[in-house]
């Protein structure tokens, strides 16, 4: 009698290529041969290319996978259709289900930070492997991290250690880097040209991580604060210069500037200001390097002119997470709304021609008020082995 282990490698590859990434771990466990094959090549690309944006999101201190199929929108022949799917992910080797406060993505790997920064580990969702990272000294609650790699594809972790005893305006920063190849931390004698707020998280692109920084200039009796872009280069282990965003707000203290990425090829920046809260502007990079950036306008939307906005939609909500679909010419914004005793995670799909669609992607656990935070979009799996 033929068993699944008797199937040819080509047939097994075709079967596994049709399985969503988030289900591969369960499927691989049914057969040692299937498990071995999937560790040497990436399956599931057909599923991803055919339909979805696969994202990871932090929701109620847990990591969730989120799949959004946007192929059904802007369909002239039939009603728009979006097929959302969100589910909690069980992380291997996290038996106690440590609550997660931060997650950083790079190259198919997720750097997970436990609440109060008590533990740090790296997770490969495709291979189902984890690696726990031991600190050089104790992790602190104000620490912030980034994940990247150098020109030799050697992965590294950047750590900002903020001095908890100083006040926020004068808080000192120390910077460490963890090298996967040597399994050790090193102290870096580097400082960025501008201030990176301790609550700021970066976006990794092509191995480097980009942050928003704040440049402070002192004019005559006036202190000006300008938001800029800053890159940490994991090859040179240095910060680049402050790069322009080309947004000129009347009052930076009341602006929302959010970073996202486009398939590990480009950066996307969303800008919104309290004074003109109904206007959402998005730009994407046409050139992006540690020392240079150029931008083009992707989309500008006046939400006051959009038809069909739901009653719960507020012009003043802060878009903390978003991604764009260049082909469909839309932006997907994430928020939450409360209906009776339940709070729902929402995705708002918006186009510059007035297109709008509201999608309920799931109930928020514990009725948390904050919307889930997007960790990465258009996830591409990795064969990077994590040896704990």
From Swiss-Prot:
<protein>
    <recommendedName>
        <fullName>F-box protein At3g49510</fullName>
    </recommendedName>
</protein>
<dbReference type="InterPro" id="IPR006527">
    <property type="entry name" value="F-box-assoc_dom_typ1"/>
</dbReference>
<dbReference type="InterPro" id="IPR017451">
    <property type="entry name" value="F-box-assoc_interact_dom"/>
</dbReference>
<feature type="domain" description="F-box">
    <location>
        <begin position="1"/>
        <end position="47"/>
    </location>
</feature>
<dbReference type="InterPro" id="IPR011043">
    <property type="entry name" value="Gal_Oxase/kelch_b-propeller"/>
</dbReference>
<dbReference type="Pfam" id="PF07734">
    <property type="entry name" value="FBA_1"/>
</dbReference>
<dbReference type="Pfam" id="PF00646">
    <property type="entry name" value="F-box"/>
</dbReference>
<dbReference type="InterPro" id="IPR050796">
    <property type="entry name" value="SCF_F-box_component"/>
</dbReference>
<dbReference type="InterPro" id="IPR036047">
    <property type="entry name" value="F-box-like_dom_sf"/>
</dbReference>
<dbReference type="InterPro" id="IPR001810">
    <property type="entry name" value="F-box_dom"/>
</dbReference>
């Amino acid at each position: 009698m033929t068993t699944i282990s008797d199937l040819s490698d080509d047939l097994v590859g075709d079967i596994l290529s049709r399985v969503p990434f988030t289900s591969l771990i369960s499927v691989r466990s049914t057969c040692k041969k299937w498990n071995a094959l999937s560790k040497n090549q990436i399956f599931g690309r057909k599923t991803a290319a055919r339909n979805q944006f696969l994202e990871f999101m932090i929701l109620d201190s847990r990591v969730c996978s989120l799949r959004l199929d946007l192929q059904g929108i802007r369909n002239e022949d039939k009603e728009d259709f979006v097929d959302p799917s969100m589910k909690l992910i069980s992380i291997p080797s996290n038996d106690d289900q440590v609550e997660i406060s931060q997650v950083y993505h790079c190259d198919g790997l997720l750097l997970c930070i436990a609440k109060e920064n008590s533990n740090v580990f790296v997770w490969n969702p495709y291979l189902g492997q984890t690696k726990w990272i031991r600190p050089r000294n104790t992790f602190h609650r104000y620490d912030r991290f980034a994940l990247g790699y150098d020109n030799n594809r050697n992965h590294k972790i950047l750590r900002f250690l903020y001095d908890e005893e100083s006040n926020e305006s004068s808080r000192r920063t120390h910077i460490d880097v963890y090298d996967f190849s040597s399994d050790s931390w090193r102290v870096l004698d580097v400082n960025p040209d501008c201030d990176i707020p301790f609550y700021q998280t970066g976006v990794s692109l092509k191995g480097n991580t980009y942050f928003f920084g704040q440049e402070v200039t002192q004019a005559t009796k006036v202190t000006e604060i300008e938001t800029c872009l800053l890159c940490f280069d994991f090859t040179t282990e240095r910060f680049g210069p402050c790069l322009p965003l080309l947004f000129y707000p009347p009052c930076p203290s009341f602006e929302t500037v959010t970073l996202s990425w486009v398939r590990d090829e480009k950066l996307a920046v969303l800008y919104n200001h309290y004074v003109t809260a109904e206007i959402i502007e998005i730009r994407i990079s046409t050139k992006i390097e540690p020392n240079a950036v150029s931008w083009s306008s992707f989309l500008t939307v006046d939400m006051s002119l959009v038809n069909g906005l739901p009653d719960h939609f507020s012009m003043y909500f802060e878009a903390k997470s978003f991604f764009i679909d260049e082909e469909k010419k839309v932006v997907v914004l994430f928020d939450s709304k409360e209906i009776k005793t339940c709070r729902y995670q929402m995705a708002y799909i918006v186009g510059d021609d007035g297109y709008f669609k509201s999608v309920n992607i799931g109930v928020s656990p514990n009725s948390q008020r904050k919307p889930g935070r997007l960790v990465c979009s258009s996830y591409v799996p990795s064969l990077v082995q994590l040896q704990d």
